[in-house]
Protein backbone atom coordinates (compact mmCIF):
# COMPACT_ATOMS: atom_id res chain seq x y z
CA UNK A 1 0.00 0.00 0.00
CA UNK A 2 2.89 2.35 0.75
CA UNK A 3 4.16 2.02 -2.84
CA UNK A 4 0.75 3.01 -4.18
CA UNK A 5 0.63 6.01 -1.86
CA UNK A 6 4.08 7.05 -3.08
CA UNK A 7 2.81 6.85 -6.68
CA UNK A 8 -0.13 9.08 -5.76
CA UNK A 9 2.17 11.57 -4.06
CA UNK A 10 4.47 11.68 -7.12
CA UNK A 11 1.42 12.34 -9.30
CA UNK A 12 0.68 15.48 -7.28
CA UNK A 13 -2.33 14.59 -5.16
CA UNK A 14 -2.93 16.78 -2.11
CA UNK A 15 -4.65 14.18 0.09
CA UNK A 16 -4.97 10.39 0.25
CA UNK A 17 -8.11 8.46 1.14
CA UNK A 18 -8.21 4.71 1.80
CA UNK A 19 -11.85 3.96 1.02
CA UNK A 20 -12.09 0.62 2.79
CA UNK A 21 -12.21 -0.27 6.48
CA UNK A 22 -9.96 -3.32 6.77
CA UNK A 23 -6.75 -1.68 5.45
CA UNK A 24 -7.08 0.95 8.18
CA UNK A 25 -5.30 -1.44 10.52
CA UNK A 26 -2.18 0.04 8.83
CA UNK A 27 -3.42 3.63 8.62
CA UNK A 28 -1.44 5.18 11.50
CA UNK A 29 1.76 3.45 10.41
CA UNK A 30 1.31 4.67 6.82
CA UNK A 31 0.40 8.19 7.92
CA UNK A 32 3.61 8.39 9.96
CA UNK A 33 5.67 7.41 6.90
CA UNK A 34 4.31 9.90 4.37
CA UNK A 35 4.27 13.68 4.22
CA UNK A 36 0.75 14.06 2.91
CA UNK A 37 -2.56 14.26 4.71
CA UNK A 38 -4.51 11.02 4.80
CA UNK A 39 -8.21 11.07 5.67
CA UNK A 40 -9.18 8.07 7.80
CA UNK A 41 -12.53 6.32 7.43
CA UNK A 42 -12.19 5.29 11.11
CA UNK A 43 -11.49 8.81 12.39
CA UNK A 44 -14.27 10.31 10.30
CA UNK A 45 -16.73 7.68 11.53
CA UNK A 46 -15.75 8.31 15.16
CA UNK A 47 -16.09 12.06 14.57
CA UNK A 48 -19.61 11.49 13.27
CA UNK A 49 -20.47 9.28 16.26
CA UNK A 50 -19.17 11.96 18.61
CA UNK A 51 -21.14 14.70 16.84
CA UNK A 52 -24.29 12.62 17.31
CA UNK A 53 -23.57 12.27 21.03
CA UNK A 54 -23.41 8.47 20.91
CA UNK A 55 -21.24 6.72 23.49
CA UNK A 56 -21.67 3.01 22.68
CA UNK A 57 -21.72 1.57 19.16
CA UNK A 58 -21.65 -1.90 17.69
CA UNK A 59 -19.28 -2.74 14.85
CA UNK A 60 -19.90 -5.11 11.95
CA UNK A 61 -17.39 -5.78 9.18
CA UNK A 62 -14.90 -8.39 8.11
CA UNK A 63 -13.58 -10.59 10.90
CA UNK A 64 -10.31 -8.69 10.61
CA UNK A 65 -12.04 -5.33 11.11
CA UNK A 66 -14.07 -6.61 14.04
CA UNK A 67 -11.22 -8.42 15.79
CA UNK A 68 -8.14 -6.21 15.30
CA UNK A 69 -9.34 -3.42 17.58
CA UNK A 70 -8.44 -0.38 15.50
CA UNK A 71 -11.96 1.02 15.90
CA UNK A 72 -12.02 0.12 19.61
CA UNK A 73 -8.66 1.66 20.48
CA UNK A 74 -9.39 4.92 18.69
CA UNK A 75 -12.91 4.93 20.10
CA UNK A 76 -11.64 4.57 23.65
CA UNK A 77 -9.41 7.61 23.22
CA UNK A 78 -12.49 9.68 22.28
CA UNK A 79 -14.84 8.27 24.92
CA UNK A 80 -16.72 5.98 22.54
CA UNK A 81 -17.10 2.32 23.44
CA UNK A 82 -17.05 -0.03 20.46
CA UNK A 83 -18.82 -3.36 20.94
CA UNK A 84 -18.10 -6.26 18.59
CA UNK A 85 -20.15 -9.45 18.20
CA UNK A 86 -18.87 -12.62 19.85
CA UNK A 87 -16.48 -14.86 17.93
CA UNK A 88 -19.20 -17.20 16.59
CA UNK A 89 -21.19 -14.20 15.37
CA UNK A 90 -18.06 -12.68 13.83
CA UNK A 91 -17.48 -15.89 11.88
CA UNK A 92 -21.05 -15.81 10.56
CA UNK A 93 -20.85 -12.11 9.66
CA UNK A 94 -17.52 -12.66 7.89
CA UNK A 95 -18.93 -15.60 5.94
CA UNK A 96 -21.97 -13.61 4.80
CA UNK A 97 -19.74 -10.68 3.92
CA UNK A 98 -17.14 -12.61 1.92
CA UNK A 99 -19.44 -15.20 0.30
CA UNK A 100 -22.46 -13.03 -0.46
CA UNK A 101 -22.09 -9.28 -0.05
CA UNK A 102 -18.82 -8.88 -1.97
CA UNK A 103 -20.61 -10.62 -4.85
CA UNK A 104 -23.65 -8.34 -4.49
CA UNK A 105 -25.82 -11.23 -3.27
CA UNK A 106 -28.62 -9.93 -1.04
CA UNK A 107 -29.94 -13.01 0.79
CA UNK A 108 -32.95 -12.35 3.05
CA UNK A 109 -32.08 -15.28 5.33
CA UNK A 110 -28.64 -13.76 5.87
CA UNK A 111 -30.19 -10.37 6.53
CA UNK A 112 -32.39 -11.94 9.23
CA UNK A 113 -29.34 -13.57 10.83
CA UNK A 114 -27.48 -10.25 10.87
CA UNK A 115 -30.49 -8.45 12.33
CA UNK A 116 -30.66 -11.09 15.09
CA UNK A 117 -27.02 -10.37 15.97
CA UNK A 118 -27.66 -6.63 15.96
CA UNK A 119 -30.78 -7.10 18.09
CA UNK A 120 -28.68 -8.97 20.65
CA UNK A 121 -26.17 -6.13 20.70
CA UNK A 122 -29.01 -3.67 21.28
CA UNK A 123 -30.69 -5.71 24.03
CA UNK A 124 -27.66 -7.15 25.85
CA UNK A 125 -24.97 -4.55 25.21
CA UNK A 126 -27.06 -1.40 24.97
CA UNK A 127 -25.58 -0.10 21.73
CA UNK A 128 -26.90 3.27 20.54
CA UNK A 129 -25.48 3.03 17.05
CA UNK A 130 -24.12 0.48 14.62
CA UNK A 131 -21.01 1.02 12.52
CA UNK A 132 -21.27 -0.64 9.12
CA UNK A 133 -17.52 -1.26 9.13
CA UNK A 134 -17.53 -2.93 5.74
CA UNK A 135 -18.40 -0.96 2.63
CA UNK A 136 -20.66 -3.74 1.31
CA UNK A 137 -22.84 -3.95 4.44
CA UNK A 138 -25.09 -1.14 3.23
CA UNK A 139 -26.16 -3.48 0.42
CA UNK A 140 -28.12 -5.58 2.90
CA UNK A 141 -29.57 -3.00 5.30
CA UNK A 142 -29.75 0.66 6.22
CA UNK A 143 -31.39 3.04 8.70
CA UNK A 144 -34.90 2.02 7.61
CA UNK A 145 -34.30 -1.43 9.12
CA UNK A 146 -33.78 0.00 12.63
CA UNK A 147 -35.70 2.56 14.63
CA UNK A 148 -33.92 2.36 18.00
CA UNK A 149 -30.29 2.86 16.91
CA UNK A 150 -28.40 5.05 14.48
CA UNK A 151 -26.86 3.26 11.49
CA UNK A 152 -23.43 4.62 10.62
CA UNK A 153 -22.48 3.75 7.05
CA UNK A 154 -18.71 4.27 6.97
CA UNK A 155 -18.70 4.56 3.18
CA UNK A 156 -21.17 7.46 3.20
CA UNK A 157 -19.44 9.11 6.16
CA UNK A 158 -16.06 8.88 4.41
CA UNK A 159 -17.39 10.21 1.11
CA UNK A 160 -19.04 13.12 2.98
CA UNK A 161 -15.69 13.96 4.59
CA UNK A 162 -13.87 13.69 1.26
CA UNK A 163 -16.35 16.10 -0.33
CA UNK A 164 -15.96 18.49 2.62
CA UNK A 165 -12.16 18.35 2.23
CA UNK A 166 -12.24 18.99 -1.50
CA UNK A 167 -14.94 21.66 -1.68
Show which residues each predicted segment covers.
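Non-catalytic structural scaffold of enzyme domains
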Residues: 1-167
Amino acid sequence: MRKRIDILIKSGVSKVFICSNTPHVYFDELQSQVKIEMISIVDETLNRISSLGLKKCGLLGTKFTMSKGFYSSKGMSTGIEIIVPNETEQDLIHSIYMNELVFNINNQDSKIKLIEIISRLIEEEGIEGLILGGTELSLIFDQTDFDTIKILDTCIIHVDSIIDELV
